[in-house]
């Protein structure tokens, strides 16, 4: 989470947007595909930064049995309900005025599903959105594993 924050948030955040990183009390090591998890989270954060002009963006994770749930919540413009069920479809965008071609979230969905996980979104127009993934993982005791991720702020 710290890597995502440093790469995506530090240079792009305005005084109007607060970044919050939440994690459980205990640090957690898990065997995950670090490159792909980072790719998905960075896309969620980039979208949140793009659509949030004031308020906050919250990056969080929690451990649930043999899975990790990672989410990015924002207080941006939200997604219209008629477009909500299409946000993970290829070439779909919630807002035609924002730059991009609409494939980022479909790529995220594909990555998460290849890892055996699931992806979702909750949103309210003019109130914000929450994008989340739940991926299976195996806890490990140290960072020496090739694809391990240290889930900490």
Predicted feature residues:
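Short conserved segment of the HATPase_c
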Residues: 79-91
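Conserved catalytic submotifs in the C-terminal HATPase_c
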Residues: 16-28
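Short alpha-helical Gxxx[C/S/T] motif in the catalytic ATP-binding
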Residues: 104, 108
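Short helix-loop "hinge" at the ATP-lid/N-box region of the Bergerat-fold HATPase_c
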Residues: 48-49
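Short, small-residue-biased leader/transition segments that mark boundaries at the very start
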Residues: 1-5
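Acidic ATP/Mg2+-coordinating residue in the GHKL
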Residues: 74
């Amino acid at each position: 989470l710290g890597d995502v924050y440093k790469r995506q948030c530090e240079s792009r955040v305005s005084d109007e947007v607060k970044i919050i990183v939440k994690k459980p009390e205990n640090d957690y090591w898990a065997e995950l595909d670090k490159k792909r998890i980072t790719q998905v989270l960075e896309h969620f954060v980039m979208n949140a930064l793009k659509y949030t002009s004031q308020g906050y963006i919250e990056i969080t994770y929690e451990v649930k049995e043999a899975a990790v749930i990672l989410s990015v919540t924002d207080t941006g413009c939200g997604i219209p309900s008629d477009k909500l069920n299409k946000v993970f479809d290829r070439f779909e965008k919630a807002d035609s005025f924002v730059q991009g071609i609409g494939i980022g979230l479909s790529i995220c969905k594909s990555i998460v599903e290849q890892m055996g996980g699931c992806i979702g979104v909750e949103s309210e127009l003019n109130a914000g959105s929450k994008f989340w993934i739940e991926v299976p993982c195996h806890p490990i005791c140290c960072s020496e594993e090739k694809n391990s991720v240290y889930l900490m702020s």
